[in-house]
Amino acid sequence: MILIADSGSTKTDWCIVFNGTPIKRMGTKGINPFFQSEEEIQQELTHSLLPQLPEGTINSVFFYGAGCTPEKAPVLRRAIADSLPVIGNIKAYSDMLAAARGLCGHEAGIACILGTGSNSCFYNGKEIVNNISPLGFILGDEGLSLIHI
């Protein structure tokens, strides 16, 4: 089984894939290693996700999420390894890479996320090659929900 996650700060969508077919979709609260400690992430995984998982071992985890910078990805990988029955690789990537892969596939293009926080990048068909820091969800995000007029 492969476990795939698409996470923002508000919610995380999870999907179990077996032999290339999605077999179960689940949801938990958002997981963001920029705002949550390793222990907080472990608690969410143990109490909210683990009870929803089907019996069996997870061969690989692909986590795409807000706050998954190269500096914070190890925190997330450790939390997953300590909380879930994973015997294989645990990969943690940014939500921006998920958007770029989903939108562009293997072609070059510009991908954007418009949500609580907004972001954009230029993707060369394999990786993000240009990205301007979005400054979080409070600064430089004029469309966000925290503005009061």
Predicted region positions:
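Short glycine-rich, Thr/Ser-proximal phosphate-binding strand/loop in the N-terminal lobe
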Residues: 2-43, 128-129, 134-136
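Active-site nucleophile and cofactor-binding loops and adjacent substrate-binding regions
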Residues: 90-98, 113-114, 139-140
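Short beta-strand-loop/turn "lid" adjacent to the catalytic site in phosphate-handling enzymes
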Residues: 52-84, 88-91, 103-104
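Short beta-strand scaffold segments in enzyme catalytic cores
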Residues: 12-17, 101, 112, 118-123
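Short glycine-aspartate micro-motif
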Residues: 2-6, 60-62, 109-113
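A short glycine-threonine-serine/GTX helix/turn-capping micro-motif
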Residues: 135-143
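Conserved small/polar residues in nucleotide/adenosyl-binding loops
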Residues: 147-149
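Short, well-ordered amphipathic alpha-helical segments that serve as non-catalytic structural scaffolds
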Residues: 39-53
